[in-house]
């Protein structure tokens, strides 16, 4: 089976992006998986922030997850890639007005201070994940949004996984070109061939 989802405030989903948090999006994802996939084995596929949420799911579904495929996953990006790089003026504005329009890597984000604070409750780099899973991360060499060192740090916290970090030579952050998607499909298929039957979640 295959389950794809958008978080609230994304795409055609209900709500506003600025009302969401890492915690609320993680909870929403847990509910959908429990409702739609019951107790099936899972391969998680997460892109950018979705990679962060995917890693959060291990706490609940650790006995069911058999593989994780990250596409430029961005855990803790709110602190490391945003807050830490904001000027004091921007930080004061965000605290006072609760929102800030942030432009980064060709993308525009309406960031709430609540989202920043919530991100601090969802750290993953201070943890160790001792799960014997297949872990594959694809990261574009030309990614201007999430630096490759983030993916390398993720590889380190998954101690017992069968790990693979793939750097796509001309890839950007989205890795949405046909050849990139073909490579993604190939990597998922490689896991699929060893672990049937299960469900893919992305």
Stretch-by-stretch model annotation:
Residues 11-36:
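Catalytic nucleophile-loop/oxyanion-hole region of alpha/beta-hydrolase
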Residues 46-54:
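Gly/Ala-rich beta-loop-alpha elbow adjacent to hydrolase catalytic centers
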Residues 171-183:
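Catalytic histidine-centered segment of alpha/beta-hydrolase-like enzymes
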Residues 1-14:
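Conserved alpha/beta-hydrolase
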Residues 63-111:
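Hydrolase active-site cap/lid region
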